[in-house]
Amino acid sequence: MNVQEIAAFSDGAVGGNPAGVWLGDQPLGRDHMQAIAAELGHSETAFAVPEGTGWRVRYFSPAMEVPFCGHATVALGAALAMAHGNGVFPLLLNDGEISVEGRDHHGELTAALQSPPTSHTALSDAQLMRYLSLLGYQHDDLSNDLPPALIHAGADHLLLPLSSRAALSRLDYDLEAGARVMREDGLVTVMRDPCCGRSARNRSLIFDYRARLSACAMFPPIVFVERTRSCVRRSRE
């Protein structure tokens, strides 16, 4: 299986968010890609083959195909730099075109991601009540600094800003119910931002029902950022 596992957003060989990356000469079938993603078990795996002057890319979680994944694209940039040298690589996605820059600085890998177009819309009262009920929250648990919203940067996400870390620690939900709601609403991740002071407002917690995660991972918010640089590491061929 011609798959690499690469951790994006790492500091050298420490930490990061792992993704699978498959590079090939000919595209695989959907079922084959889905099986590889399920076997790897990472939240996303990127599959890329040459097309024209760039690369045709598709993303799969262990359970389904998704339209885009930022950290898997960062990992893909590192893999392309290792395989083809430093450069900017055009990427053709299911729903648009972007690029990723990959560079190998004497063994230290970096990638610069061009985000797909971003947008956001406010939640309706009915939507908000549905999500609060699912997650066991009340209106009083929400922060007044940032409105709940549906946000988009290549894929659709739900953002629920909370008033405190204590509220975040009370998070409780039924995994099957969460997966059902996300499938019905076309959501890829649910983000909760514990807005308890200025320092906390620069970080978001992301929960991924598709991978059935029992823990959460911290990421700097990049939804409304046009480009972001990230260190990556190659963990296994």
Give residue spans per PLM region.
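Short beta-strand scaffold segments in enzyme catalytic cores
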Residues: 19-22, 46-48, 98-102, 158, ...
